[in-house]
Design a protein with these regions (language model features):
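Glycine-rich dinucleotide-binding loop and its adjacent helix/turn
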Residues: 21-81, 183-184
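A Rossmann-like FAD-binding core segment of flavoenzymes
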Residues: 1-20, 46-52, 58, 80-184
Length: 184
């Protein structure tokens, strides 16, 4: 029908999608959230204000997981809120998908970069809040489909960091409700 009316295609804009998580032990602990939720709450809901309707726990030792632009935004936001921020990324800095300018600005603001490490578990305190992250030490293997060298775990080598907030910035996936709501 639409072709007869001169239309050439249809665009379905499903929004930013759903944030990805890593599905690791302890990831449902308190004070672990997606970068989408973190940045939305801080920037649009005044969540850094303890008197706000939905206040956010402001981390003193913040771990941001990921290597893209959103991870850099999350790092810099947490730093500006007073946190000691460490970015953890499973590949080397050269493989980070973030723009070089974003990485440069994050470093200038004092973000600690811990590359070739990947979270494998979060440990919670007696109240259910994250208190530590267990990181697998990685090394680079052969290039994958993206052309970047694949991260490979170094056997029996882990590091544990004390953290009180984790922001997961490992991408988004399409919302499955959109295709399910369209016929044909």
């Amino acid at each position: 029908q639409l072709e007869a009316e001169g239309f050439k295609g249809i665009f379905v804009g499903s929004g930013a999608g759903l944030p990805n998580f890593m599905n690791i032990k302890g990831e449902n602990s308190l004070n672990i959230m997606s970068s989408n939720e973190y940045l939305t709450r801080v920037n649009l809901m005044d969540a850094a204000n303890p008197l706000a309707d939905t206040p956010l726990n402001i981390g003193k030792h913040v771990l941001v997981v990921g290597g893209g632009n959103t991870a850099m935004d999350s790092c810099r936001t947490a730093k500006r809120l007073g946190g000691d921020v460490t970015l953890v990324y499973r590949r080397s800095e050269a493989e980070m998908p973030a723009r070089l300018e974003e990485v440069k600005h994050a470093k200038e603001e004092g973000i600690n970069f811990l590359t070739l490490h990947n979270p494998i578990e979060y440990i919670a305190d007696e109240k259910g809040a994250v208190k530590a992250a267990v990181l697998q030490v990685m090394e680079l293997g052969e290039p994958d489909a993206s052309g970047r060298r694949s991260p490979v775990p170094v056997e029996d080598k882990t590091v544990t960091l004390d953290v009180d907030q984790v922001i997961v910035a490992v991408g988004v996936s399409p919302n499955p409700l959109v295709p399910k709501s369209i016929e044909g």
